[in-house]
Design a protein with these regions (language model features):
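Short, structured coil segments at secondary-structure junctions
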Residues: 1, 25-26, 136
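Conserved beta-strand segments of alpha/beta enzyme cores
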Residues: 4, 28, 139-141
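Short phosphate-binding loop-to-helix
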Residues: 12-76
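An accessory alpha-helical subdomain
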Residues: 156-163
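N-terminal glycine-rich phosphate-binding loop and ensuing alpha1 helix
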Residues: 1-14
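Conserved core of the sugar-phosphate nucleotidyltransferase
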Residues: 63-155
Length: 164
C-alpha cells in the first residue's frame, strides 16, 4: 500500500513554478540536488520517514498503477532491495523502453543508503538504475510481463528527449 505520494524535484529556480503549484494544491514535495538524484531521493525518504521508494519518474507517463501496487507489495513482503520491470529475469536490459515505461522501479531506502555511501560520483542526473543493477550486494528482482517482446522492442513509452 502506498502511504505517500511525494514529488521530488530540484533546488533550481526553474522548478519554482512547479513548487508553487504543488503548494497551492497541498501536494507533498521535496527539493534537492539537480545532479545527485540518489542523494535527493535518500534525503526525501529521510524527511518523510519512509523505508520504500517507488519511483514513477515524470517522463514515464504510461506507468501502470497496478504495477505500482505490485512493486510496493513485493518490496514490503520479500527480501528484495531493488525491483524493476524488464524483459528477462536474468539480466537488466536498459534498452527496453516499453517495459520501463509501464513498470516503475522500486527500492528499499536501506539499499539506497548503502549505494550512496559507495558511489564515487555525485553526478547521476541521467539515472540511478545501473547503481542497483551493477552492485552484487543488492538483491534484485525483475517483473517480466507476459507480452510479445518482439513487438514491444520497437515501442518507446517514456519521454526522455524532445523527439519522443
Amino acid at each position: 500500500m502506498v502511504r505517500n505520494v511525494i514529488i521530488c524535484t530540484t533546488n533550481l529556480p526553474s522548478d519554482d513554478k512547479l513548487v508553487k503549484i504543488l503548494e497551492e494544491k497541498n501536494i507533498k514535495y521535496f527539493r534537492g540536488s539537480d545532479k545527485d538524484i540518489l542523494q535527493r531521493l535518500l534525503d526525501a525518504a529521510k524527511y518523510y520517514h519512509t523505508d520504500i521508494i517507488i519511483d514513477v519518474s515524470g517522463d514515464k507517463i504510461y506507468t501502470d498503477v497496478n504495477y505500482v501496487d505490485q512493486v510496493s507489495k513485493i518490496l514490503q513482503k520479500e527480501e528484495i532491495d531493488f525491483i524493476r520491470g524488464n524483459n528477462s529475469n536474468l539480466e537488466f536490459d536498459p534498452g527496453d523502453h516499453f517495459v520501463h515505461g509501464i513498470i516503475p522501479g522500486g527500492f528499499k531506502v536501506s539499499a539506497l543508503e548503502e549505494i550512496c555511501k559507495r558511489k564515487k560520483s555525485n553526478n547521476n542526473e541521467d539515472g540511478y538504475t545501473e547503481f542497483f543493477t551493477s552492485m552484487d550486494f543488492i538483491k534484485k528482482y525483475y517483473i517480466v510481463p507476459n507480452i510479445d517482446f518482439s513487438v514491444t522492442k520497437k515501442i518507446k513509452l517514456d519521454l526522455d528527449y524532445p523527439e519522443d
